[in-house]
């Protein structure tokens, strides 16, 4: 039995096809989110990889920022529930999830069974999000994917004290004019993000294991800065961007099983 989970975010679209609720047979990430061709391109890639068609997929669950704009799904489920389900499937001992997305940052607290107990979110300001990193990368003229490796060479991290993106831009430009090293500026940017997000973690309560997901989790500099700020090791799964889509695919499997039961009872 095949089920599918789609996670349509603000800046990326992700998809997972699951077999029998256990095996990931295909996954895909496209750097285009809601309101773009991203979701349809994810489907095209997934079907191309597997040779499957829509009629072969028993159930589809969609999650993410753009879930309500996607009509060809059997159910919409919040990204909070889907990330909790997906992460718990990969790392059952997880108690805290840090999810830094393109437009917001979320911290989730799970119980011993992987169920969502509580969450906090920062969605009022770009600082502390992937968007903030995109803006900063453009200012210092590097690709955002290179920030993590660049920051690892820092020996004299500069301070980025502003919590507002506009003022932080001015600080970075000032550091550049003072000939600060790029790696030291990037390290300061990472610490700025980590401080903002770690305040959410501390408010909700740090419980190990702590797992970080989302595209920003691929940035080793951010992960290191976050671990330092909360004084706890952070685990990054092999598929940090896909945990929401995976959780959605698992919920889709639940839906498919329930449908089978209903058919048998007729």
UniProtKB/Swiss-Prot annotation:
CDD domains: ASKHA_NBD_HgdC_HadI-like. GO terms for molecular function: 4 iron, 4 sulfur cluster binding; ATP binding; hydrolase activity; metal ion binding. Binds 1 [4Fe-4S] cluster per dimer. Its cofactor is [4Fe-4S] cluster. ATP binds at residues 10-14, 102-104, 134, 215, 241. Keywords: 4Fe-4S, ATP-binding, Hydrolase, Iron, Iron-sulfur, Metal-binding, Nucleotide-binding, Plasmid. NCBIfam families: CoA_E_activ. Belongs to the HadI activator family. This is 2-hydroxyisocaproyl-CoA dehydratase activator.
